């Protein structure tokens, strides 16, 4: 079976469960980018509770067919498969065109937040050198490439070996032969997923907050180390 997923930034345990359980995984690269999703956000456990780490992004400019926009009397038009708004409004851009923003200190801030949250976790020092480059190096320009590199490293550390490909075109919901999890795995208003049941594991702040389920794969990895794979089954 093949699972159809959206790209994620240090995705949740539920997302990595699909990588472990399915024979093949397709990452949708032609869907429209949506804010406040796991595409550029992950959730970690801190002393204050759940904290969201969000990667700021930039939209690549689109070449707009002005003759097409004029013919639509100022309404939306489709440009290269993406919806563009005229009159100076921002266009809707698909995921493969989203770039990482170099403004601000988000890399340093994310790394400091992770150090603060997991510095006392059982496996932070063990994996620290594997994780640091994602917050200190700027070799990735596109969000999709950045997320793919993170996914590859996380799979290596957890010791899972999924077959992952990117989609060659946008796959419409309920019309593909894959099991579609794109709207199932999201931080707000997720759809039901009978295939996933969070298994409690040790967390640094469990005595204060109880078990916080389905956080970033970082939470599972840094708390459980090599045993992480058992919580994806």
Question: Where do the language-model regions lie?
Answer:
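Residues lining hydrophobic/aromatic ligand-binding pockets adjacent to catalytic sites
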Residues: 1-76, 83, 87-233
């Amino acid at each position: 079976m093949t699972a159809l997923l959206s790209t994620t930034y240090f995705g949740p345990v539920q997302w990595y469960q699909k990588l472990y359980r399915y024979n093949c995984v397709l990452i949708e690269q032609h869907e429209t980018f949506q804010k406040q999703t796991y595409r550029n956000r992950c959730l970690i456990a801190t002393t204050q509770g759940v904290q969201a780490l969000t990667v700021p992004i930039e939209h690549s400019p689109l070449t707009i067919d002005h003759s097409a926009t004029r013919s639509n009397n100022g309404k939306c038009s489709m440009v290269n498969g993406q919806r563009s708004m005229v009159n100076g409004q921002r266009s809707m851009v698909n995921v493969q065109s989203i770039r990482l923003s170099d403004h601000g200190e988000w890399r340093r801030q994310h790394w400091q937040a992770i150090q603060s949250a997991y510095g006392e976790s059982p496996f932070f020092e063990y994996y620290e050198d594997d994780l640091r480059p994602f917050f200190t190096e700027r070799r990735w320009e596109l969000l999709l490439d950045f997320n793919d590199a993170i996914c590859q490293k996380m799979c290596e550390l957890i010791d899972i070996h999924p077959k992952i490909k990117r989609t060659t075109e946008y796959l419409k919901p309920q019309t593909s032969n894959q099991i579609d999890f794109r709207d199932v795995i999201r931080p707000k208003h997720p759809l039901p997923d009978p295939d996933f049941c969070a298994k409690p594991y040790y967390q640094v702040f469990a005595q204060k907050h109880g078990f916080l389920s389905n956080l970033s794969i970082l939470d599972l990895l840094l708390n459980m180390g090599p045993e992480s794979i058992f919580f994806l089954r």
